[in-house]
Amino acid sequence: MAAKQVLFGDDARAKVVQGVNILANAVKVTLGPKGRNVVLERSFGAPTVTKDGVSVAKEIELKDKFENIGAQLVKEVASKTADNAGDGTTTATVLAQAIVREGFKFVAAGFNPADLKRGIDKAVAAIVDELKALSKPTTTSKEIAQVGAISANSDADIGDIIAKAIDKVGKEGVITVEDGKSLNNELDVVEGLQFDRGYLSPYFINNPDKQVAELDNPFILLFDKKISNIRELLPVLEQVAKAGSPLLVVAEDVDGEALATLVVNTIRGILKVVAVKAPGFGDRRKAILEDIAILTGGQVIAEEVGLSLEKATLADLGQAKRVEVQKENTTLIDGAGSVEAIKARVSSIDALIAAATSDYDREKLQERKAKLAGGVAVIKVGAATEVELKEKKARVEDALHATRAAVEEGIVPGGGVALLRARAAIKDLKGDNHEQDAGIKIVLRAVEEPLRQIVANAGDEASVVVARVLEGSGNFGYNAANGQYGDLVEQGVLDPAKVTRSALQNAASVAALILTTDALVAEQADDKPATAGLPHGGPGGFGGPEF
C-alpha cells in the first residue's frame, strides 16, 4: 500500500480553500451575460472554447493532492447541480466558494464548525421555502424562450427555437440536440410515434419519389415472434383483404415464404402490405410493442396472453390514420387508441422513470413516454467551425435543461435577484446558539455573491449595484446585458426556480462538509526522479538521430 500524507487543522483547511479557490476562480468568469470564455486544451485536435461552468470544472485536476481534494469537492457541487437541474453550475460554484470563504473566517475565530453547519442548513431551508413562494409557473412560449436565452448566455435564437420545439411536442415531448449541416439552427419535428426499423423489402415502396411505403388508414398487426410460415398469416390477410384496408405487419422478423408472399401480394396489387421488424430487444421490445398496441387500439399477439396468429381477428389489430415506412424508420400518425389508455400507460412509465437507477434506462423510458405523449423534436445546431459547433451545442443542451426545469417548478427573477429577495426570509431567523447565528450570517452574505460576480464580469462596481438592488423590492434588479436597472421579469431576465434552489442546496451541502473538515489524507507524492537519459540527447554529446 502506498504511503500517505496527513494534514491537520489550519494547515488542512488552508490547502482545501486554496483548491476551492483555484477551481471556482476558473469557473466564475463565465457567469452572466457578459461572462468570459474559458479555453480548454485537448491532447489532440483543436482546443474547446466554452462558457459552461461544469465543462470547465470537469477539466481541472490539480498537481498538489491536498489542494486537489478541495477542487474535487467543488467539482461535485457543479456536477450534482447539472444532474439535478441541468444548469446553474456556475452559480452553485460561486455560492460554494462564498460559503467556504465566509465560514472559514468564523472557524479561524474559534467557532464550532458543527454548529456553523447547523446554522447554514437552517438558513438554506428557509431560503428554499421562500424561493418556492416567489416562483410563478411558466405559462407562455415567450417566458420559455426567455429562460432558454438566459441559460444559453443571452442567445435569443436558441431560446426561440427551444420554445418552438416545446410548442410542437408539448411539455412531455422529447427534444434532442444534434449536429446540423448548415450555419443556422434548424428544428425538425416528428409527429406521431416513430421507431428505428424500416421496411424488410424495397418492393414494399409505393412512393418511388420519396422512397417510402405509405399506408392510409391501415390495420396494424403486432406479433412478438418470427413469421416464416405463410399459413399462420393467411387468416388475418384474408380478413384484411375483405375489409379493403392496407396492413402493417410488425414482428420480431418476417422471412422465407411469408415475406415472399407479402411482396408478391403487394406487387400484384392484391393487398397493400408492409412488413417491418419490431424495435428493441428482449423485454424492451415487448414493452415497445405494448406501447404501439395501446397507441393504435390493438393487442400484441403473443402466446403469453393466449393469442395465436391463426386465430387473430380484426378486433385484435390496431389502426392508425397514416403510416410512413422509410428504409430505417417507421412513423405511426394518429393512432386509434383511447386517450384514457394512453394516459394510464404514460403514468405507468412515469412510475418506472422514478424507480429507474441507471441513466440509460431513464433516458429510454423518457423516450417511450414522449413517443406516446406528444412526439419528438430534433434541434439541429448550425455553426461555421467544429469548435463553435461544440460550444454552441453545449449551450443549447444547457438551455434545454433550464427550460424543462422552468416548466417543472416555475420561474423567479434572474440576475441573482431571487436569492437576494429570498434572503428576507432569514433576516430575523435565529439559531439555537450564537454559533448557529453565525452560520445563518454566512448564508446571508453568500447569497449576494452570484449578483456580485455577474456585475464584476460586466465590468461594474459590485457593492454599488448590490446596495441599489437591495433598496428596491420584488422583481427590481440589475440587467447586466444592458447595464440598466428595472423589472427583470418584464425585461425577460428569468431563472428556473429549480436551478436556483438546486445550486444553493448543493453548494451549502458540500461547503458545510468542507467547513467541518479537520484532517486530510492523500497519497505521498512520488519523489522518484525521471529516468536519466544520455546527456545532450545522444552518444558522445551529439544530438540524437533525426527521423
UniProtKB/Swiss-Prot annotation:
Pfam family, one: Cpn60_TCP1
Localization per Swiss-Prot or TrEMBL: Cytoplasm
Recorded superkingdom: Bacteria
CDD domains: GroEL
The protein's enzyme class: isomerase
Quaternary data: Forms a cylinder of 14 subunits composed of two heptameric rings stacked back-to-back. Interacts with the co-chaperonin GroES.
GO BP terms: protein refolding
Name of the protein: Chaperonin GroEL 2
GO CC annotations, alphabetized: cytoplasm
Biological source species: Azoarcus sp. (strain BH72)
Recorded coiled-coil stretches: none
Residues involved in ATP binding: 30-33, 51, 87-91, 415, 479-481, 495
Organism classification: Bacteria, Pseudomonadati, Pseudomonadota, Betaproteobacteria, Rhodocyclales
Sequence segments annotated as region (Disordered): 528-547
